[in-house]
């Protein structure tokens, strides 16, 4: 289906650019006719595939209707392209006297016959005319849209987008889990550091109390020495004698 869409888009663009190519001295008619022939062959294959789908009871009805709607849509686009091609050829083949070259040139007339749709495609279109209204109600076509998107293609694109979003969400979830584990590890480390700081504060308080106690003793000794200077000198000399004697 995608190949057929590409071919129709390509031949439609060639038809639109036909006049510009003729101005540069090129003749794209043979290439356009070949492309139109390829489109008819692809439509013939789709017509045969549609017949097989309709005969297969295991195929869901919506699948058959989607395929039929796509086939009708492509047939209409082919007819529109052929009509535009014929209009341009008629316009470019009318000489100054107003007579048409198609009536005088049998080769051009035979080429005209090549552009008629295949009988099998005419049969498919006529057999599906009764369900055109239903098909258009189920799959409305925007007249301004040159390339309507098939429902299956749209569903596949939507599913692919959902899968990509799911993968992205999975990556985000894994990243959040890693950050969560890192947060737990940092919390544990901070708790250990808090315990260590508490122990250091306790040790500092204990040392400070010892210094205060020693300071109080020194102050007490200093007051005693001021009250009894002679006794203090005697005690100091005795301490020195004991120290010398021990050496």
From Swiss-Prot:
Xref: PROSITE patterns: T_SNARE (PS50192)
Keyword Protein transport in record: yes
A GO-annotated cellular component: trans-Golgi network
Chain coiled-coil ranges: 27-94
Claim: Iron is one of the keywords in the record: no
Annotated Pfam families: SNARE
One GO-annotated biological process of the protein: intracellular protein transport
Bilayer topology term: Peripheral membrane protein
SMART domains assigned to the protein according to its UniProt record, in alphabetical order: t_SNARE (SM00397)
Polar residues bias spans: 100-130
MF (Gene Ontology): SNAP receptor activity; SNARE binding
Keyword annotations of the record: Coiled coil, Golgi apparatus, Membrane, Protein transport, Transport
Annotated spans, Disordered: 88-130
Location relative to the cell: Golgi apparatus membrane; Prevacuolar compartment membrane
Gene3D superfamilies: 1.20.5.110
Boundaries of every t-SNARE coiled-coil homology domain copy: 159-221
Function of the protein: Involved in vesicle-mediated protein transport between the Golgi and the vacuole.
Protein name: Syntaxin-like protein fsv1
Organism: Schizosaccharomyces pombe (strain 972 / ATCC 24843) (Fission yeast)
């Amino acid at each position: 289906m995608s190949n057929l869409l590409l071919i129709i888009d390509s031949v439609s663009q060639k038809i639109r650019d036909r006049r510009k190519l003729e101005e540069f001295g090129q003749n794209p008619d043979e290439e356009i006719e070949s492309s139109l022939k390829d489109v008819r062959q692809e439509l013939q294959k789709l017509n045969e595939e549609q017949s097989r789908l309709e005969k297969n009871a295991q195929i869901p009805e919506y699948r058959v209707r989607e395929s039929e709607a796509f086939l009708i849509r492509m047939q209409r686009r082919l007819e529109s392209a052929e009509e535009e091609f014929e209009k341009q050829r008629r316009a470019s083949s009318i000489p100054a006297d107003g007579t048409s070259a198609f009536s005088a040139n049998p080769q051009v007339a035979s080429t005209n016959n090549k552009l008629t749709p295949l009988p099998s495609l005419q049969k498919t279109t006529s057999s599906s005319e009764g369900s055109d209204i239903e098909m258009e109600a189920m799959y409305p076509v925007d007249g301004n849209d040159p390339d309507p998107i098939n429902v299956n293609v749209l569903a596949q694109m939507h599913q692919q987008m959902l899968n990509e979003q799911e993968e992205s969400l999975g990556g985000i979830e894994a990243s959040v889990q890693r950050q969560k584990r890192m947060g737990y590890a940092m919390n544990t480390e901070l708790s250990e550091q808090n315990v260590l700081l508490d122990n250091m504060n306790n040790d500092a308080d204990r040392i400070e109390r010892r210094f205060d106690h020693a300071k109080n003793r020194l102050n007490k000794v200093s007051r005693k020495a001021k009250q009894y200077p002679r006794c203090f000198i005697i005690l100091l000399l005795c301490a020195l004698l004991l120290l010398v004697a021990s050496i």
